[in-house]
């Protein structure tokens, strides 16, 4: 192998899987006729040649096979199985286990409808977030995720009520206007998208779920629901547009207020997470504008007294394991778990009144 790590051998294909394989004197695979496969991981040193032996138990030997690295850095399985992180994701039989008190429903993208747990080979902040709020609340928890990547608050997610404005010689669209911007003094030529369309798509999908609560969640039929809070981790696309970055704070304040109004949840808590790559001591330009905006709306910052005790911002740079928002943090599961957990912990503090 090229890299040092823990590996699992899967020799044979079809009937030839029935064999016993040893690597460097250690049995790593056993599949006897009529019995279950037994595989044992082995640590191998990158670049080092080692002997192996395969004893086929049928006449179907074909020599095909492959190996799988078990401890790929940044994967959830490696973090749990080899670094001892997030032990609550597995049961005492070392099987991934779903919670029976936190339910996940995803719409638009990241779709799914299941009890919160590991699966599908994908991860989002909702996994860590759900465990934190689930541990806090005695009542069952519903996480309703409505999301779409590569969307800006200044254009795609622009909330209702935002007006057009001028910046850098351009007029930027207000809610429902199109296109995104146009030269001052010219007539705008609409395109097949408008300011706030992603807001409309995402939150109308959320309404559709909640308006049909009993049908969507028959296990909670007749119980009803209460919206306790919103979680918002966004900002990547806005940093590529100076006009959008300049209004990020105003738009975020309005988003908080309008979501509470739209979902008839005036007391709902609001947790925001900053972009993981953006550091306080080095941020510049548009990235600094967005970071400063996200930090400014935190109720403890003092700029918005009405947000005291009900809006909190999580500074995520210390939690990011590298990469950036535009690369989905290189898919590092620890980044998503730790930021999700931090957002959940922040939500719990707001719910506790701390």
Predicted segments with their positions:
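Acidic/polar, compositionally biased interaction segments
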Residues: 1-72
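Cell-envelope and extracellular/periplasmic
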Residues: 73-354
């Amino acid at each position: 192998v090229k890299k040092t790590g823990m590996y699992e051998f899967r020799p044979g294909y079809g009937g030839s899987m029935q064999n016993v394989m040893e690597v460097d004197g250690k049995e790593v695979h056993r599949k006897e006729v009529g019995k279950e496969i037994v595989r044992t991981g082995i640590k191998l040193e990158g670049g080092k040649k080692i002997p192996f032996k395969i004893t086929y138990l049928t006449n179907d030997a074909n020599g095909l096979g492959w190996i799988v690295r078990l401890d790929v850095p940044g994967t959830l399985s490696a973090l749990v199985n080899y670094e001892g992180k997030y032990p609550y994701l597995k049961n005492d039989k070392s099987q991934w286990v779903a919670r029976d008190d936190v339910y996940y429903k995803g719409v638009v993208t990241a779709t799914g409808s299941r009890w919160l747990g590991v699966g599908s080979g994908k991860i989002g902040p909702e996994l860590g977030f759900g465990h934190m709020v689930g541990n806090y609340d005695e009542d069952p928890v519903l996480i309703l995720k409505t999301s779409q990547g590569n969307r800006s608050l200044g254009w795609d997610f622009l909330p209702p009520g935002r007006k057009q404005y001028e910046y850098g010689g351009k007029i930027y669209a207000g809610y429902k206007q199109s296109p995104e911007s146009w030269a001052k003094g010219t007539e705008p030529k609409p395109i097949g998208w408008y300011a706030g369309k992603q807001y409309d798509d995402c939150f109308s999908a959320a309404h559709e779920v909640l308006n049909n609560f009993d049908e969507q969640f028959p296990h909670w039929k007749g119980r009803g629901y209460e919206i306790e809070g919103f979680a918002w981790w966004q900002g990547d696309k806005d940093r590529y547009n100076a006009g959008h970055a300049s209004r990020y704070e105003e738009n975020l304040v309005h988003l908080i207020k309008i979501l509470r109004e739209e979902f008839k949840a005036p007391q709902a808590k609001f947790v925001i997470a900053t972009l993981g790559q953006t550091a306080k001591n080095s941020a510049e330009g548009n990235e600094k504008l967005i970071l400063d905006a996200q930090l400014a709306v935190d109720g403890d910052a003092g700029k918005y007294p009405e947000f005291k005790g009900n809006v909190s911002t999580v500074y995520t740079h210390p939690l990011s394991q590298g990469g950036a928002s535009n690369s989905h943090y290189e898919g590092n599961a620890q980044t998503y778990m730790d930021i999700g957990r931090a957002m959940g912990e922040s939500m719990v503090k707001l719910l506790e009144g701390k």
